[in-house]
């Protein structure tokens, strides 16, 4: 966790100091990752909005790997994952890429997959995770 402190905020709330690390997004008003008290909260997406769910899933997972590393975590420490798909008929294709990436059974988090309007016609997937810091 030594590389985590670069974005550290110390917030005093009712006499208690909270150490919160925020990894700001390119988008205004949000972070790609936040860590606090040994937990990391990360959102991943394909910044390039590649064609097809397999490409967007792979790019989102590369993005997730990078953001997890920024907050001192990794896929082996995932606790909970929610995958949002713009079209649930793409779930089987997404699962192929996910299963290849996640690796052995010891890495498997609790996971849900939900159909959602992702706000535009090009974004096919967003992945939201909670992970332990390692």
Give names to the regions the model predicted.
Residues 1-79, 85-134:
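N-terminal presequence-like segments and the immediate start of the first folded domain
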